[in-house]
Amino acid sequence: MLNRRTFMTTAAAVGGAVALGRAAFAADGWQAKYPELVFGAIPAENGTGVADRYAPFMDYLSKELKTKVTLRIANDYAAVIEGQHAGNIHIAYYGPASFARALVTGVKTDAFAIDVNSDGSKGYYSVFYVLAKSPVQKIEDLKGKVLGLVDPNSTSGYNMPMFKLNSMSIDPDKFFSKTLVTGSHENALLALAQGTVDVAANWWNADDDSNLTRMLNKGMLKGANGAVLKKEDFRIILKSDLIINSPTAYLDDLPADAKAAISQAFLDAAKKAPEAFAKLSDGKNKPWEPITNKDYDKTVELIKFVDELNKKKA
């Protein structure tokens, strides 16, 4: 089974980059030192889904940068952090909290592009879902129930939920009968659909743009009886304050001209490779915009706050 120090690279994940890797890229400039760049992505969905979503974009990057770009999908959020720390992942797509964790733990990485929503905003929310048939109407009704979270390095699936519960004077260890860390946003909703958890934390941009809607569009959610679930089978009982959108970051020690080329390739992607760009977000996002590490200072504060909460409980 994959763990933090191992990654999977499937044929589908590499996509067009497999063929491109055999092509003769120009071996001058920074490409001579970096005949291959590795792009790492956090496991927001299952491996096959990520591979299919990113394959055309890896093809575009390989052509644009004139060097092979390979997609590697981590089994958990920490694997992306550790991959960049070890220098094995040159470009990484993070969640806000996992990026903040990378900075706090000393990873020399620089954010250069931020996701932009269809309405031009650059943030999203953490929500608590329950099944619509559940009698639960508010968080306080969940005493003694099972809470489903995502990953300790997830913003919307762990850190923000922990912050919100604390602001309501709720200690998850005492309030819930059990807290299940499911490993991904998809797994959290699958656990809710199957009745394994009574409430699940997840990300939400808008009514038509969330992990829930993506999974529903794929027919991935079925109840314990095997029936395919619909949007009306789920209900949000709590929504967080706005969270800054996810960044893409490259290693700080890459050559300056390599970083400039990578950044420009991302900023130009929506125009130069519209289909590949659209596939990344199911057509929901606008072109990337520049971002810096400084923009994630509040997220760094958030994870440090949650770290202190966990230390007090230990």
What positions do the PLM features span?
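Periplasmic-binding protein-like
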Residues: 41-42, 118-127, 218-254, 260-263, ...
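Extracytoplasmic small-molecule ligand-binding "clamshell" domains
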Residues: 29-100
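An extracytoplasmic/periplasmic, membrane-proximal ligand-sensing/linker region
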Residues: 30-56, 62, 250-314
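Beta->alpha turn/N-cap motifs
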Residues: 74-77, 87-105, 114-115, 201-213, ...
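Pocket-lining segment of extracytoplasmic ligand-binding domains
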Residues: 146-148, 152-255
